[in-house]
């Protein structure tokens, strides 16, 4: 059982990372967006230097929170979570995925490469959100693997949906500038497939997840 203080501190750390990633994502050298959540993005309201430093501070705050004994008395579990977060944000996770996002602009990219990019820049963080409480609760490797796998499919579907919303929603709905992916030549699944094919793809991915985790789902949730 996880105490409220444990999961609240993990939540604070995750939100710090989320906010850092959005601030840096909006920078002129990245996605160059003037708005976030219906308000001026950090670099527009203040300046680019402040935005970079604010993002850096929020990034570091997450590790400060997770390393504190208040998060959990077991140093081993805290180290495991910190290690997991470091991998999530590094070259095989968020940072690597964002670099691919920039590299793939105005290029014809295969579906498999786009999905890999989605998983790196989005799914890895979703997986961390799912795995961290399992680590704190001292769950076994199979249970942690299930949590990771769930985060992967959840993050993938979220990113696909986010790209679709960018195409057909307005500023009021999104809280940011719509249609930027197409204008910037972003490689997205919707740039390769129509809506019906994307729906089929998503349903197949869900089915794969269910098949991989069928025994766990039946044992623990039915």
What are the functions of these language-model segments?
Residues 1-214, 220-221:
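Mg2+-dependent prenyl diphosphate-binding active-site environment of isoprenoid biosynthetic enzymes
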């Amino acid at each position: 059982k996880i105490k409220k203080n444990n999961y609240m501190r993990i939540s604070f750390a995750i939100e710090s990372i989320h906010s850092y990633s959005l601030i840096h994502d909006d920078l002129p050298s990245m996605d160059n967006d003037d708005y976030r959540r219906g308000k001026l993005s950090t670099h527009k309201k203040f300046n680019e230097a402040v935005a970079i430093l604010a993002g850096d501070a929020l990034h570091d705050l997450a590790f400060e929170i997770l390393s504190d004994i208040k998060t959990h008395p077991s140093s081993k579990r805290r180290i495991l979570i910190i290690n997991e977060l470091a991998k999530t944000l590094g070259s095989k996770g968020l940072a690597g995925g964002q670099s691919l996002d920039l590299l793939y602009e105005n290029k014809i990219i295969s579906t498999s490469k786009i999905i890999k990019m989605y998983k790196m820049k989005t799914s890895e963080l979703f997986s961390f959100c799912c795995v961290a409480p399992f680590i704190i609760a001292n769950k076994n490797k199979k249970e942690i693997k299930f949590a990771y796998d769930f985060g992967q499919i959840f993050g993938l579907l979220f990113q696909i949906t986010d790209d679709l919303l960018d195409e057909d929603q307005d500023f009021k709905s999104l809280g940011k500038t719509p249609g930027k992916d197409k204008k910037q030549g972003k490689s997205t699944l919707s740039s390769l497939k129509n809506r019906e094919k994307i729906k089929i793809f998503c349903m197949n991915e869900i089915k794969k997840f269910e098949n991989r985790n069928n025994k766990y789902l039946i044992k623990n949730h039915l």
